[in-house]
Amino acid sequence: MHHSTVLSVLSLLAPAAQASLWVDRAPSYVRPYAIEHYANANALTIGSQTYRFPVTGPSSGNRFTMLMTNAPQSGDLGVLPHIHEQHHENFFCYKGRFQLWAHKGNDTEARLLTAGDYGSVPVDTTHTFQILDPDTEMVGVVAPGSFEDLFYFLATQNVSYETQTPYTPANLSDDAGSGSSADIITQLVSFDVHAALNFTPPRDLVNGSRPAGAIWHDDINEIPSSSGSPYFVASNWGPKYLNNVTGAYQVVQPFVTPTTGEGNFTQGTITLGRRFLNASRQTWNLTDHLALNILEGAVDLTIANETATLLAGDVAFVPGGIPFSYDSRAAFSKFLYVSAGVKGLDQQLLADAAEWSWPVFPTTSP
């Protein structure tokens, strides 16, 4: 290992040894950390929506931003239709329901997303969404990072809820803050938001999807073999792979591949069982950054002799070059992963995995 690489790793380990993994907001520099679900992580409101930012540009070395949006149902769009020319935006439904539209070229796709569903909005794609259930949470991943600056600019107010409630329980304006005046739109261009006000979202969804006959919660959702087009993956209806060589069963379900992420990031879910009897603990040391968002169960994440028990909704960030291990404390755990680059945790697991037809692992150890 080069001397400069050793110094780089030590510089990351030093603050980790001095401070707890648990923080209440994303750090201003790259270090390992964990944030509790609904912590006031730079929380702000835009209309009726409350946004939190467990991973930011500064905390990820500008590789990606992760944001949580909590809001009640609304009869209006959550944001004006718009395009990003430099940012790939990803939508995941943690709970509740929302509708997502994506238009590119001559095609307009739409899906009704429920818990576990995913939608990919690559660059140059017109998109918008509408929140439909009283307790909805969207997990957004935007690459590259620092996209949170847009929301800081648009914020109605910064908030710090004493009770850590998901959002303000009050009848508030549904104005998403993206504005319709030429002045506001011009300012938003600097944040890579280009208004597409001529786009009218179609409402002719059948069984939660558009166009007619689109595969959704009724058959295998394939991931495109090329990049650039929007696509959707229904919960547990995408490709699945089983890894049984790391001391525990792990089922990997990719949403974003090295191809569709254009080499910048990958994303998906990993379902994890308890460690096999007498199996040794696997230690990982990735070349690039990793974020985990727990969806179900409980996961013990160990870094530099500190173990954080992550529960549903919690987020952890592990920088590249930092050794770590993780185990499922529960019989069945599942987390959303975001890996910077193309050599992330998912790719390491997939290298020793086999195609699998089920979202759960086998009944007996290998």
Model-derived segments and spans:
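Double-stranded beta-helix
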Residues: 132-214, 325, 329-366
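A short, N-terminal "cap"/entry segment at the start of jelly-roll beta-barrel domains
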Residues: 19-70, 172-268, 273-274, 361-366
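Ordered, small/hydrophobic-rich secondary-structure cores
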Residues: 70-169
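Fungal secretory targeting signals
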Residues: 1-20
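Short acidic-glycine-tyrosine-enriched beta hairpin
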Residues: 36-37, 59-63, 90, 104-124, ...
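Long compositionally biased, domain-poor regions of proteins
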Residues: 130, 147, 273-275, 288-302, ...
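Glycine- and acidic-residue-biased ligand/ion/polar-headgroup-sensing regions
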Residues: 85-104, 281-305
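Short histidine-centered beta-strand/loop micro-motifs
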Residues: 55-57, 77-85, 102, 130-131, ...
